[in-house]
């Protein structure tokens, strides 16, 4: 209801921030519980969010759109800028720590972590400004002829209804973050009992919190608003990195233990391939069933290699 009231691209932004709040709450609760495995939970969850959004949600949205209309059409300027932001944030926070030499292992020094946090937050703020103010038209759905899609036939909710929805959303977020204290250990225990790698904890968290985004993106794609689907996907990835990393960096001052952010070789390859394939997908402003299959294959490879590294 809030998203319908404020319209695009503000609606996608509201949902992305709400999802990120839940994600941060789950990560923090897991890290507070401590243990040797807690050091990599933030990295695993953020990377999983990037792979789920850029491959899973994008691939599924393109699949639905191309099955419905053969060719999915979107705004290359807005999608390209969003993808560039995702790639830059992911490289700064997840790739560079694997190659820096200030500390042993895939970790930032204190100064490097502070720089990465400030840079991530600044770039996120710049992206939001461009998306909602400077070049809002680049993030609006378009028709096959490149013209903006008309407004929804459904009347937007009243201002009073939107305010009630906003209040309920805030209350729900507080409740969900509070429940994270109970849910996080259960996820960790379930993964350990199943004998799965620790990285699966991050995948499980990301899959759970991104489910609303996935449903909203598929619904938009079914309605011919592929740009809205891409706004949701890339916006969630940007929020996941741009808000989660600064928050975890700040909390690391009080949390004991290291903070591992650098990716391993397999995940570096998957991230590089995702960036390359995504660029080839968004630059033309049109996509077919083939592009959706490529993204879904990359997502399947990520899930499989997380379970069986």
Regions found by a protein language model. Give the residues of each.
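Hydrophobic alpha-helical segments, chiefly the membrane-spanning helices
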Residues: 1-309
């Amino acid at each position: 209801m809030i998203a319908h009231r404020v319209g695009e691209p503000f609606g996608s932004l509201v949902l992305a921030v709400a999802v990120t709040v839940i994600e941060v709450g789950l990560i923090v609760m897991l890290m507070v519980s401590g243990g040797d495995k807690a050091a990599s939970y933030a990295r695993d969850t953020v990377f999983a969010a990037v792979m789920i959004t850029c491959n899973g949600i994008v691939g599924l949205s393109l699949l639905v759109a191309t099955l419905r209309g053969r060719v999915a059409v979107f705004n290359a300027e807005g999608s390209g800028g969003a993808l560039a932001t995702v790639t830059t944030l992911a490289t700064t926070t997840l790739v560079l720590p694997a190659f820096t030499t200030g500390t042993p292992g895939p970790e930032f020094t204190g100064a490097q972590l502070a720089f990465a946090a400030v840079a991530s937050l600044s770039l996120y703020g710049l992206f939001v400004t461009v998306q909602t103010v400077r070049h809002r038209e680049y993030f609006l759905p378009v028709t096959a002829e490149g013209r903006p899609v008309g407004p929804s036939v459904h009347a937007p909710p009243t201002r009073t209804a939107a305010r009630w929805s906003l209040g309920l959303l805030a209350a729900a977020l507080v409740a969900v973050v509070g429940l994270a204290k109970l849910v996080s250990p259960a996820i960790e225990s379930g993964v350990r009992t199943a004998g799965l790698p620790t990285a699966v904890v991050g995948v499980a968290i990301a899959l759970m919190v991104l489910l609303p985004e996935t449903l909203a993106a598929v619904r938009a794609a079914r309605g011919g608003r592929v740009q809205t689907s891409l706004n949701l996907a890339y916006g969630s990835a940007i929020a996941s990195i741009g808000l989660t990393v600064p928050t975890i960096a700040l909390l690391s001052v009080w949390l004991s233990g290291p903070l591992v952010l650098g990716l391993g070789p397999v995940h570096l390859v998957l991230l590089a391939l995702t960036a390359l394939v995504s660029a080839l997908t968004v630059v033309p402003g049109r996509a077919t069933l083939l592009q959706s299959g490529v993204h879904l294959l990359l997502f399947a490879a990520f899930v499989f290699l997380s379970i069986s590294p």
